[in-house]
């Protein structure tokens, strides 16, 4: 959580008032739900501020809750998100399991320590995610991190999961930054060459769809938010859609209303599919 943490408040008086305000609150008497709700509220408020750019890492909680309720995860099963953002899918799945099942001691321990696994390559967002999970009683402050800082698309995860819930970052192409000979920063399209992918493409969303399929156990289930290009793009997109229909039970496509995301004009959908034996 504290990896590469920085203090960006330069005004000593302002920092003093902030510390004094935090210190005056009786945090010990608050339940985990209250602290977690306060933190979630701050994240959502920050996402609503379009100037902050945080909205791209924050999936609307009503959408997350609806997706989790459609998938209906069960106790003792694993849940992954290869683009974790601030951890919304993990929290919603946690709440669903606690509210809908009478969990015994072993199931509660599994839920806290072994259920969730994710990736988030943006360091600040990953830090927000880990704190969000900790405040909602998922994982430990000093234990092994449930959210890896590595790019999920570079290589197979090496693990398979019962459920994958994700809203991969929008923006059509994967890219990488580098410094050219003149010392200037440039970006270049990034193509992932993986033997377990059906097609090679620089389209980020199509790569996430392929990657998520490889993350599923034989009986695994997935729900993914995707933009329109995943449904309509030709070439590699057509190949991936055909393979998805042949190799999984793609049973539902949910069209989302415009305006549901903080980024303006985004047209998005949720695809639900169940893996099956080859």
Model segments located where?
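Flexible, glycine-/basic-rich loop-and-beta segments that form/coincide
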Residues: 179, 261-278
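A generic structural signal for residues located within well-ordered alpha-helices
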Residues: 34, 59, 124, 204, ...
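Glycine-rich S-adenosyl-L-methionine
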Residues: 186-216
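Non-catalytic, mostly N-terminal accessory regions of nucleic-acid modification and defense proteins
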Residues: 1-75, 141-152, 255-259
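Conserved S-adenosyl-L-methionine
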Residues: 53-166, 171-175, 182-184, 206, ...
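Short glycine-dipeptide loop
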Residues: 216-222
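Glycine-rich, charged/polar anion/phosphate-binding loops
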Residues: 208-211, 254-258, 268, 273
